[in-house]
């Protein structure tokens, strides 16, 4: 559910960064990383996807589809722990990615990528197969 103050969007010249500001959903929601000699808690990819799908999965964004496909392909076992949170909006999410508005495809094409460069159709197939298997 969307609540006031639940989402934070930072805008930079290089692009936007969205944060879902909500309590953790998974038991192992974060890892401790060393950043310049300091211990920093960083949410796991599965936690990030769980929050995106649970709190706004009924309003697909290109970035959410991209991130979901990436995590499915790189960390599928970890993502299975998020199953209860992925099911909430699964049907609406699947309908929206399979019958996309032109703006969803355009948004996807505008994503700056580095080492993961899938097509929109590839991400739809990966997300669809995974979500239907739950």
Predicted region positions:
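Compositionally biased terminal segments of proteins
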Residues: 1-134
